[in-house]
Structure formats: structure tokens, C-alpha cells
């Protein structure tokens, strides 16, 4: 089949400089959701009709399998599809989708395509409040004969609850002829794609319908209110899938998945968590409240406390992290590593059973196994122009308030005394410290303020 995605609308009610189809749901542009769904149908040609936002839309959505057609003037949906005619392949069916209707499922579209074998098929839905939608008009035998837009509908037609979603599968061989016969003598002065229904009926071609599993599948976005409503619906759908798969969610209404979340068994996720990019949670991982994980792999049995922020990191099994821990890109933690509150790790490898339990910065470092990093420890990795590496070998104990001025190496089994500023390599199995001699001045008095 061919698939044409209409993405030329301006979206005035969005009150935004960003083209409507580029506004995100679950961290991905509306139109990208539609494109990704379309790809699962393996179309012969996949064409995006763009207009408002022009090159921004093209550059954002660009992909080798996409063809493009420009609708310079927005003269209606029929006019929009006509711009794509020269790009269509020879496939028997052409499926028309909308770049601002992001949640239609592959299963629903397959039903629509099946209904449209040797016919024209339209996706319809019954709404409790059909206001604003084109109504499906049927004859006495129940056959669909036309779609009447809201602005052109009579009072009797406005009472119809079955409405047009705009999504349809059209016989490719008839599409160009039908589009050429469209007229714009309507309240909007536009060329409606829906008018091809009457043309098909006049030719004696059957017009069949299919319906989605849920109303949310065909909801479009025309305002920030609708964008927020659809975001919540989508997140509830994703949360429902997690629950069915065995994940324990403290509250399905308070989770955001903005990418791909895979998981093992007995995973638990508390409220307010955000998952971006590709996140993998192995068996028995626990994620505390209000954590952000972006492109992170977490090993089995690891516990993550509240308010952690991890990005582009790999966490080994049975770790204990947080609260308020931050892992920046390039971090790799081995098994049973502890990263505690207000500890930041960047582009560092930390070996098994090592601990940095509080108030530390570890950057551009390679830390061995069973290392204890005391509170207030800082790897001084940046001289204002270049980054340098710190190496801490196995079984090292680093006292509190220690600065390691890279490049520097701490040998296996070494101990660094509290308050040390290390500027040279520390030998293995020895105590290294640097601090001024402690002094006491008897009788010393603090300065006193003099009242003026």
C-alpha cells in the first residue's frame, strides 16, 4: 500500500512558533508517532505532506524511507492529498493518516485496510459528543453514502453520533480522478477529502467502515489542552501495559515513559518517575519516587532511592543508589556499588563493592574494587582547558574532604588521610596525607564589632 500522512496544518490554537505536528507526546513529535506506526504496515511508499513550518518539519522528521510533498496553501484535506499524487506507488490501496492524530494502533489500521479490499473504507467512531466532527450519513439500508462536515450539517445531521475520523483507505487507481472532481463550494471554501465518498457511491463502489478499539485512538491535537489530555491517555496506556506485564507501579497515573522501557520480573517503580530514551531494568530493580533515568541499564536487584538523575549510564547488579544521586554520561558501576546522597559521577568506571556514600564528585576516574570514598572527596579533573584522569586502585580508603588533583594514581591498598590534597601519586599499602600542622593560640579573642 501507499501511505500519505497529512502534516501541513498551522495549528493556530497551539499559540506556538513550533509547527503543530512537531509538538511532543511522550518525548516524540506527534507526526513521528504516526510515521512509526505507518512503518509497521510496510508500505510501498510513505509520503508526508508538509506546509506550515516547511523545512523545520522536513529536517526534524527526515528519514531515508520518507517521500515529501509540499502543500504551499492549505486549501483542505483533498487538496493536501492531491499534492502527493505524483509520489504514489502502484499499490492497490492508499491509506491517508494525519500527523496530529498520533495514537491510532496498527491493529486498527489493519482492520481498516482489510475492510477496504476492492472498496473504499473509512475509519469512524461513535462519540457521546460529536461536536466539531464530520457526520457519517447512511441510507435506510445502513450503507454509508456521505460525510457531512459540522459547518455544513443540518440540525438533523448534527444529531448523528457516528463521526468521521479522517482516516481512510482509498483505491489508488480511482484517487486521482476523484480528487480532480472535488469542489470547494462549502462553508470553508476548501476541498474536502471526505467528498470522495459521494463520488464512490455514485460510481457504485462499496463504502465500508471500521472502528477503533477506543476513542483515544482517533483523537487529534489542536490545542495545548488536547495535547496534555492525549499525553495523559498515552501514559496511562503505557502504564497499563507495564502492569499487565508484571511491573508494580505505585500509581499508574504518575509515570512518564518518553522512550523504550524494558524490564525483568518483580520490578517496582514509585510515583513521579520519568524514563527517557532506552532504559533497561533487570529483575527485582526498585526505583524510588521522582527519579529520572535516560538511556540507562540497571542490573538485577539494584535499589534506587528518591530524586536520582541518571543519564547514559550502566549500573551493575545489587547496587544501592541515592537519594539525590547523579550519574552523568559515561558512568559504569560494577556489582554492589553504593552511590549515596549528593554524589555526582561523570565518565567514570567504579569497581565492585566500592562506595561513595555522600557529598562527593567523581569525574574522569577509574576506581577499583572495595574502595571507600569519604564524604567531601573531589576528583579535580579540569584545569580550565583540559580534562585529566584519576586512577584509584583496589582496596583504597580515601578520608573525608580529600582532593585528588588529576592526573594522579592511588596505589592498591593505600589510605589517604582526611583533608589531603593529593598532587602526586600515592604509593600502595601506605598512608598518605597532606595538611598543615595544627596550631593553638592561647588567649586569642575574636574581633568585636564596634558600635558607631
Curated annotation (Swiss-Prot):
List the transmembrane segments: none
MF terms (GO), sorted A to Z: glucosamine-1-phosphate N-acetyltransferase activity; magnesium ion binding; UDP-N-acetylglucosamine diphosphorylase activity
Where is this chain primarily localised? cytoplasm
Region named Linker:
225-245
Q: Which GO terms describe its cellular component?
A: cytoplasm; membrane
Q: Which reaction does it catalyse?
A: alpha-D-glucosamine 1-phosphate + acetyl-CoA = N-acetyl-alpha-D-glucosamine 1-phosphate + CoA + H(+); N-acetyl-alpha-D-glucosamine 1-phosphate + UTP + H(+) = UDP-N-acetyl-alpha-D-glucosamine + diphosphate
In which residues is UDP-N-acetyl-alpha-D-glucosamine bound? 6-9, 20, 71, 76-77, 98-100, 134, 149, 164, 222, 328, 346, 361, 372
Which branch of life, at top level?
Bacteria
Per the record, which residues fall in region N-acetyltransferase? 246-452
State where the protein is found: Cytoplasm
Q: How is the cofactor bound?
A: Binds 1 Mg(2+) ion per subunit.
Which residues are listed for acetyl-CoA binding in this entry?
Answer: 375, 381-382, 400, 418, 435
Cofactor(s) required, per the database record? Mg(2+)
> Which keywords does the record carry?
Acyltransferase, Cell shape, Cell wall biogenesis/degradation, Cytoplasm, Magnesium, Metal-binding, Multifunctional enzyme, Nucleotidyltransferase, Peptidoglycan synthesis, Repeat, Transferase
Q: Where does Mg(2+) bind?
A: 100, 222
Pathway where this protein functions? Nucleotide-sugar biosynthesis; UDP-N-acetyl-alpha-D-glucosamine biosynthesis; N-acetyl-alpha-D-glucosamine 1-phosphate from alpha-D-glucosamine 6-phosphate (route II): step 2/2; Nucleotide-sugar biosynthesis; UDP-N-acetyl-alpha-D-glucosamine biosynthesis; UDP-N-acetyl-alpha-D-glucosamine from N-acetyl-alpha-D-glucosamine 1-phosphate: step 1/1; Bacterial outer membrane biogenesis; LPS lipid A biosynthesis
EC number, as in UniProt:
2.7.7.23, 2.3.1.157
Q: Which residues form the active site?
A: 358 (proton acceptor)
Q: What class of enzyme is it?
A: transferase
How is the subunit organization of this protein annotated in UniProt?
Homotrimer.
- Belongs to which family? In the N-terminal section; belongs to the N-acetylglucosamine-1-phosphate uridyltransferase family.
Its biological purpose is as follows: Catalyzes the last two sequential reactions in the de novo biosynthetic pathway for UDP-N-acetylglucosamine (UDP-GlcNAc). The C-terminal domain catalyzes the transfer of acetyl group from acetyl coenzyme A to glucosamine-1-phosphate (GlcN-1-P) to produce N-acetylglucosamine-1-phosphate (GlcNAc-1-P), which is converted into UDP-GlcNAc by the transfer of uridine 5-monophosphate (from uridine 5-triphosphate), a reaction catalyzed by the N-terminal domain.
Under HAMAP family, the record lists:
GlmU
- In Swiss-Prot or TrEMBL terms, this protein is called Bifunctional protein GlmU
Q: Name the gene.
A: glmU
Amino acid at each position: 500500500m501507499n501511505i500519505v500522512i497529512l502534516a501541513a496544518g498551522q495549528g493556530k490554537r497551539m499559540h506556538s512558533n513550533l509547527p503543530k505536528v512537531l509538538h511532543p507526546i511522550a518525548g516524540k513529535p506527534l507526526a513521528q508517532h504516526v510515521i512509526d506506526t505507518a512503518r509497521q504496515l510496510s508500505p510501498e511508499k510513505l509520503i508526508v505532506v508538509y506546509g506550515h513550518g516547511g523545512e523545520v518539519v522536513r529536517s526534524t522528521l527526515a528519514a531515508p524511507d520518507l517521500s515529501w510533498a509540499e502543500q504551499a496553501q492549505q486549501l483542505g484535506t483533498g487538496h493536501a492529498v492531491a499534492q502527493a499524487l505524483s509520489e504514489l506507488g502502484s499499490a492497490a490501496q492508499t491509506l491517508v493518516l494525519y500527523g496530529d492524530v498520533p495514537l491510532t494502533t496498527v491493529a486498527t489500521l489493519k482492520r481498516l485496510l482489510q475492510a477496504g479490499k476492492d472498496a473504499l473504507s473509512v475509519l469512524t467512531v461513535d462519540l457521546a459528543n460529536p461536536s466539531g466532527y464530520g457526520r457519517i450519513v447512511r441510507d435506510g439500508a445502513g450503507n454509508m453514502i456521505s460525510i457531512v462536515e459540522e459547518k455544513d450539517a443540518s440540525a438533523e445531521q448534527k444529531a448523528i453520533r457516528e463521526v468521521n475520523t479522517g482516516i481512510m483507505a482509498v483505491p489508488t487507481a480511482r484517487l486521482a480522478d476523484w480528487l480532480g472532481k472535488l469542489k470547494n463550494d462549502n462553508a470553508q471554501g476548501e476541498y474536502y477529502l471526505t467528498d470522495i465518498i459521494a463520488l464512490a457511491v455514485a460510481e457504485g463502489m462499496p463504502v465500508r467502515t471500521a472502528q477503533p478499539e477506543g476513542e483515544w485512538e482517533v483523537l487529534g491535537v489542536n490545542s495545548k489542552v488536547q495535547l496534555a489530555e492525549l499525553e495523559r491517555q498515552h501514559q496511562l496506556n503505557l502504564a497499563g501495559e507495564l502492569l499487565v506485564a508484571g511491573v508494580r507501579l505505585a500509581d499508574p497515573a504518575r509515570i512518564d515513559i518518553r522512550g523504550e522501557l524494558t524490564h525483568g520480573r518483580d520490578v517496582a517503580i514509585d510515583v513521579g518517575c520519568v524514563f527517557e530514551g532506552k532504559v533497561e531494568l533487570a529483575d527485582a530493580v526498585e526505583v524510588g519516587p521522582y527519579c529520572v533515568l535516560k538511556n540507562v541499564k540497571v542490573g538485577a536487584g539494584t535499589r534506587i532511592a528518591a530524586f536520582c538523575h541518571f543519564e547514559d549510564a550502566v549500573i551493575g547488579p545489587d547496587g544501592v543508589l541515592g537519594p539525590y544521586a547523579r550519574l552523568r554520561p559515561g558512568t559504569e558501576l560494577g556489582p554492589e556499588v553504593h552511590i549515596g546522597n549528593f554524589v555526582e559521577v561523570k565518565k567514570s568506571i567504579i569497581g565492585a563493592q566500592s562506595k561513595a556514600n555522600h557529598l562527593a564528585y567523581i569525574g574522569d576516574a577509574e576506581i577499583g574494587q572495595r574502595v571507600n570514598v569519604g564524604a567531601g572527596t573531589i576528583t579535580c579533573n579540569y584545569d580550565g582547558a583540559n580534562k585529566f584522569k584519576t586512577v584509584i586502585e583496589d582496596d583504597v580508603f580515601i578520608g573525608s574532604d580529600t582532593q585528588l588533583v588529576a592526573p594522579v594514581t592511588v596505589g592498591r591498598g593505600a589510605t589517604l588521610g582526611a583533608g589531603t590534597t593529593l598532587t602526586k601519586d600515592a604509593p600502595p599499602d601506605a598512608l598518605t596525607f597532606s595538611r598543615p600542622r595544627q596550631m593553638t593560640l592561647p588567649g586569642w579573642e575574636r574581633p568585636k564589632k564596634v558600635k558607631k
